[in-house]
């Protein structure tokens, strides 16, 4: 995760085209999320059929509450029209979620047993917001209370056989993943290291430095041992990236890895090691900002690395979300993923909601991403824990306020507007957009159509949703997010 970028910069990044639409009649039958009755399974598309509406307003007066239904009619409507076309099919969705950092686990475990179970159900169950994808760190991230890997040694020692490899320092994470899998056994997990063990690095430090070439094969075995150890705990690692933010060596922990080095590591060491161990965990390249699509393209253009690589992962602390589409268009047989974006303790709810829904949710999906992840799940009231030099302003989806409570932050609602209504294996379909209405649409495995709309206008916006020659006329409040299900 990036620490030092100015958050206001990101709001100015251009949104890669995206469309769809949304509505809202604020005649509220204001039902809380806990009153959800499987919103992805009801409705229809004939004249008189209802459109279910869920809304969050930037002023926080309404947060993920169901509103009065809109209704389809045979009339064409006038003014702005968002058209949804289910005949145009795009990528299948793996899921939406966050990174379950060690720090997140630490603070969630401070809740009472009952309150912790309530939170996990809220986040991961189908009656909650249904998070379907998690990222975890291999060893510590900068949002752990201490720096560690799974093979730390006294200074000057090495362990080429990895005889001292152990998950011991992550047992709390392992246990919470088991608790989460008990709620959603189908959740996908992406694992990423912030650094290799320092004895494998050319600077002997957790900050920066690079992997020594003589340890490439040992580090590949480190990944194999990790995946096998997690599998032994009943935790399947669906995918890995070789390095978090490989071009950001200033974080603690961190490690610098060029595109050439990553291609060499994958083609000559990691890929063959996975093959030899019969591991089918996906290898995803890059895992850094949208300003440098040349990095994943260099890895994918390597003819020996390419067969081992499932796709590329991106963050948006610099660049434009359209980078995902650029890479997809050049390698349409490879996947793209959006794996991290943080909200800041200095941000504001309205601005963060607007920028993140447009970019992280709508923008990434319209640019072929199979997932969309915000950063950490949870933090304490001081935006910790974090390592020395780690992020001091990262605001999680929830803030743990004590043993008895937690507060839901903007990142909770950013993800919830997708995760609650767009389950894994949904497929993106076509939608139009305009007049500061950003949209994306999906067809769920249950046959429902889901439309997510971000109204970036400061005032109310009336528009029409057109689907199968039927039209629903709706009005959406200024600076708000709506999800429509029909």
Model-based region annotation:
Residues 100, 138, 244, 315-316, ...:
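Residues that line or immediately flank small-molecule/substrate-binding pockets and catalytic motifs
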Residues 48-58, 62, 74-80, 189-191, ...:
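Substrate-binding and catalytic surfaces of secreted/luminal carbohydrate-active proteins
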Residues 143-147, 197-204, 246-251, 292-295, ...:
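Short acidic/His/Gly/Ser-rich catalytic and metal-binding motifs that mark active-site loops
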